[in-house]
Amino acid sequence: MMSNEKRGEAIDLSHHLSKVGQARQTSPLKSLHKYMGKPGLISLAGGLPNAGYFPFASVSGEILAPDSFPLETGSKDSSLSWFWKLFSRSEKERTSTFTVGKYPKHPGDLNLESGLQYGLATGQPKLNEIIREFVGKVFQPAYSNWTTLVHTGNTDAWSKTVQTILNPGEGLIVSEWTYPSAMASAQPFGVIPVPIGMDSEGMSSISLQKTLAEWDESVRGFPRPRVMYTVPIGQNPTGTTMGIQRKKEIYDICVEYDIIIVEDDPYYFLQQGEYVPKADRVTDAANGDDEVFIASLAPSYLKVDYQGRVIRLDTFSKTVCPGSRLGWFTCNPMFAERLERTAETSSQAPSGFTQLYVASLLLKWQYDGYIRWLKALRLQYKQRRDYFLDCFGEEFHLQKAFSTEGYTAGAHLYYASLKPKRSFVPLSEKDTAYSKPLFSYIAPTSGMFVWLELHLEEHPSFTSLGYKALEMKLWTEIAEAGVLFAPGAMFFATKVEDDTPGPGHFRVSFSNSSPKEMKKAVSTFGTVLRKFMHTRI
């Protein structure tokens, strides 16, 4: 790892600020905070409620031990025993307690007097120290003057970023399949999505280069885009993982065309690796020291960002809890200062309670404890993914084939056809509705989702209805049977019209259901498919 002394500073990228981003000024009242720490100061300037009237004398909580979840799953025969224990809650949880008092016992202690008071958008100093240490050790930015800034979760962080660096009528580079809430957030600001082709690592550097090199403003109607939005790990919805070589390729293209990369990475620590079918699986283990664990993760764009053109969005939503609404930016100081100005007159600092609770958790665990938690968390979600995909293998007949085209190129595809159940319909050897694949997927390598591509060409009403109508009809019947999938059309970067060509898709989550529910959901899906494929609409 190169020392900061040998690394250059971020280049001047202020020309990427939007008109709104340029116009923001320091909140007049917030500008007074620079005097607040002066010894002996009597402040009569701000409308700060008296901390003596806060109705909380202290706050406290119980924290799970960082090693509450195992780093290995045991023998092959009992590989799910820990999984069932997770839902039975038969074993007493090991916890420790923390308490935050109203006033600090020692200088720098967490306390309610300052933690629950109005403050700067930069948040609690102690939490900032923890975050900065974590980023330096884990993400290792490639320039010296990087900084961090807390925010209220990646959704709001992205909204602030859009306002800060994008103007109405400008383009935004995105993957052809992308996170719909990010697009919904940008759309009211008049931002135009520019879809880029994908393969099994996510955004294709070849497609990106081609799109930018061939850009014709007179045809497109707006200038070549200068901002990219990407979810490189656990790509939402496809579940792919982008490696360091692809990131270097894309980063170099962004340097060539002067593009800012917004790296939205909530699933970073849920990198599960390749799926191994149940019959071939051996004991899972996450042993190894902290550096081995960190080295096993696909690096962030920060690792190759020597110019400060990456704005990274991190969140505690997937590693602690989503209700915390807490995360942080990592970016160059110029962007951080502009984002701070945006927060001053909107969300301000994240919730004081949230900051105190999360800071207390991380102080209790320390860096080593948090890394231990993350190691086990990755294994937990890996086992969930494996079990869910195993259920597909039990319910459907699967054929594995290497894909060379489209967003699955470079990965093995699983083609699923129905296993006949004579209790539903008569079956002949030539029944194509059973013998041909009805959907396919690549096993996700990160995140929480499986992305199913539907193959409904053998449906008796396909010629008259087409892909989209059949997709939504099938989705409705699955929902009415008690299982809810996310319709694929909402994840397309641009609006899907009735005549948009191409197969339908479903995004299916394995993150929050019990093993029994997962198995039932896949079985229900199979039952609905059997009936659906033999029903003319």
Model-derived regions: residue spans:
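Short beta-strand segments
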Residues: 43-46, 195, 229-232, 262-265, ...
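Short, solvent-exposed loop/turn segments at secondary-structure junctions
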Residues: 47-51, 155-156, 178-180, 201, ...
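Conserved core of the PLP fold type I
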Residues: 68-258, 262, 268-304, 381, ...
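Conserved glycine-rich beta-strand-loop-beta hairpin in the small C-terminal domain of fold type I
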Residues: 374-378, 382-389, 401-457
